Amino acid sequence: MEIRILYKAVGKPWQEASIDNTLGAMQATVGGYIETARIAKNVVVVCNEEGLIRGLPYNCRVMGTDFVGDIFVVGTKGEEFVDVPVSLEDWQRYWIGGGNGND
């Protein structure tokens, strides 16, 4: 089953995407082991757990936290990942303050 995410590759703008709701697909999306950072009750940023250790390039800041490497935003329901509950337009307007998220 696929889930809808908001994806941001290093140096690229945010985009809507879908990935398989599997650990392997999530690891492939961030290029390694995953780590989550909760930014709201039902929303997390998924990033590469070893991004800083591996010296991955800076990506962006989300809700006051800097991220390196490719990341994505997804919704949560309990312990499960679900479709991201916000549109790309609302994400850019309300969550990251407009622009392309490269700040």
What residue spans do the PLM features occupy?
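Domain-length accessory/inserted modules outside core catalytic folds
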Residues: 1-103
